[in-house]
Amino acid sequence: SDSGKSYDFNVASDLNNLLVNALLATGQLLPDNEYDFDFDHQFIETEKFDAKITYKKFTGYSPGIATVGDVIVGIENRDGNTNVRFHQEDTLKRIFERLENARIHINRARMDCGSCSEAMVEMVEKHSRHFYIRANRCVSLYDDIFALRGWKTEYINGHEFEICSI
């Protein structure tokens, strides 16, 4: 890392290729179809010898996991003490390119605030038709959004949302 810290990182390319190929072979993914894509880091508590303390104060791992619908399409493991932003752009690029090589197209990509950076937005925009990346909480952004006029209530998939165009 830029700070001089050392992290263990496993991109598991062969296993991720096998995973996507198995999903195609079993018909769980179909080439030339569009899918919704989700990415997040999961914290897995474990007492294995190589596990490290996470910022959540337990020993474990924090792999980045990508799903399409209800199937996992990519996993890259990292130390529990690795910042979620560390090489996340590289992780997502590998996963998106693996799916594109299999002719799997991403309609909508969703990620949490760990993916909120200009570089991530630019990269995700290249690999999906639409995307949602939750912004980091920030007082000035909250104030700007609160000041917007024209909010309206919409129901999407049975859930009520307040929406407004910027």
Annotate each predicted stretch with a short phrase.
Residues 1, 35-43, 70, 106-116, ...:
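Short, conserved catalytic/metal-binding motifs centered on acidic residues
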Residues 1-65:
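Active-site-proximal, Lys/Arg-enriched surface segment
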Residues 1-7, 45-47, 73-81, 104-108:
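Short acidic, glycine/Ser/Thr-rich loop/turn "cap" segments at secondary-structure junctions
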Residues 41, 76-79, 113, 135, ...:
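Short, structured patches in soluble enzyme cores that scaffold and shape functional sites
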Residues 47-53, 73-77, 111, 118-124, ...:
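Short acidic, glycine/serine/threonine-rich loops at helix termini
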Residues 55-102:
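Electropositive, glycine- and tryptophan-enriched low-complexity nucleic-acid-binding patches
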Residues 84-142:
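Domain-level cores of phosphate- or acyl-group-handling catalytic modules
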Residues 130-166:
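An anionic, glycine-rich sequence signature occurring as long contiguous blocks
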